[in-house]
Amino acid sequence: MSYKENSFYQDILVSECFYVATKSKQLIGYEILGESRVCLWSDKTLAQPFLDAKGIDFDKVKKIDVDRFVTYELDNIFNEGDQVLVNPTTKSDGELVDVVKVSDELMSDLDSIRLKEFAKDVAKEDAVFGLSEKGAKQFALISDDEHQRPHIMPVWSIKSRAEKVRREDFDTLELVEIEGAVFDDWLDTLRDDDKAVAIDLKPGVVGTVVSAQKVIDQLAF
């Protein structure tokens, strides 16, 4: 079952975030079909009226970045087949969805969208930004040990995004700009060495990681 046509799915795809209610730092659920389900909302304004109407005590409604959730929290909180209640309101019971499946589908679509946007920006500006050790002639590689990805080259198509991540997560490295043609050559080497590319990472080092071949294919369009 695909969730692509659901309105909540499209909302999260655009905003790249969702909202949950917490009490003492624990996720709040609501009993439906005899079982308590964690509630989440694609629109923050839907949460409090529902919680108040149901008499559910909570500390706050918290914004969750979907990349950070999938990278650091999903596997620690949920198991395969677990369902969450999406967008319950005072007028609607909401939808029960498989949290792992919908997360996988969202990330697949986000990866595709980001890769296309990256390629479009690079074609327009003929510039790619990366991080480098002082004096080095190559972009730095990072590791994602948790997902067994030891060699990843983070790159950005927009300088301000790159600088924000550099400042918050890699302050010992320098921001470097190269031309698109140089990046094309580097991609061939990354592909031959079976290394990955991180596209427009967010602070916290979360976001889209794809094979070098996928980037090559997209830039060819």
Annotate each predicted stretch with a short phrase.
Residues M1-F221:
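Conserved NAD+-utilizing ADP-ribose enzyme module
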